[in-house]
């Protein structure tokens, strides 16, 4: 699906946390 885990944001094709 779309979106990332809570506290994370999309970076290109992946999600990044912190």
Swiss-Prot record:
Cellular component, GO, one term: extracellular region
Positions of post-translational Glycine amide modification: 18
Domain of life: Eukaryota
Localization per record: Secreted
Keyword Endoplasmic reticulum: no
Tissues in which the protein is found: Expressed by the venom gland.
UniProt KW keywords: Amidation, Disulfide bond, Secreted, Toxin
Chief place of localization: secreted
Disulfide-bond pairs as recorded: 4-15, 8-17
MF annotations from Gene Ontology: toxin activity
Family named by the database record: Belongs to the poneritoxin-Ae1 family.
Protein's name according to its UniProt entry: U1-poneritoxin-Ae1g
Natural source organism: Anochetus emarginatus (Ant)
Biological classification of the source: Eukaryota, Metazoa, Ecdysozoa, Arthropoda, Hexapoda
């Amino acid at each position: 699906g779309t979106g990332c885990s809570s506290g994370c944001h999309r970076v290109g094709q992946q999600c990044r946390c912190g």
